[in-house]
Amino acid sequence: MAKKRYRKVTEGIAHIKATFNNTMISVSDPQGNVLCFRSAGGSGFKGSRKGTPYGAQMASEEVGRLARDNFDMRRIAVRVKGPGAGRDSAIRGLRSAGLEVIHLEDRTPLPHNGCRPRKKRRV
């Protein structure tokens, strides 16, 4: 079987969605076409360990290495969405994978007093 040929994309965008249960990182080209994707669950973490900062860091290091090796990516803009624990450690993982972070943006959706929130948990 022939080896898959990847195109050269030197700059990209990392979309990080950090929920309380998991962290998902997808890397796209500047037009928004997804090149590679990884989540903490896809990196081998199961159950409550998916929502940890360590799981987010391992997933982002993996996806950063994929983007660097397969697409020759060097510089990356980061868009973070969500309140999860893996926000900062996912950015740290991209840096440790050898990618230079050129732009950081928080895209967490905030309601302007929209829907009524769910009831508070009583533990």
UniProtKB/Swiss-Prot annotation:
It comes from Coxiella burnetii (strain Dugway 5J108-111). This is Small ribosomal subunit protein uS11. NCBIfam families: PRK05309.1, uS11_bact. Located on the platform of the 30S subunit, it bridges several disparate RNA helices of the 16S rRNA. Forms part of the Shine-Dalgarno cleft in the 70S ribosome. One of its GO terms (molecular function) is rRNA binding. PROSITE patterns: RIBOSOMAL_S11. Part of the 30S ribosomal subunit. Interacts with proteins S7 and S18. Binds to IF-3. GO terms for biological process: translation. Gene3D superfamilies: Ribosomal protein S11 (3.30.420.80). The keyword Ribonucleoprotein applies.
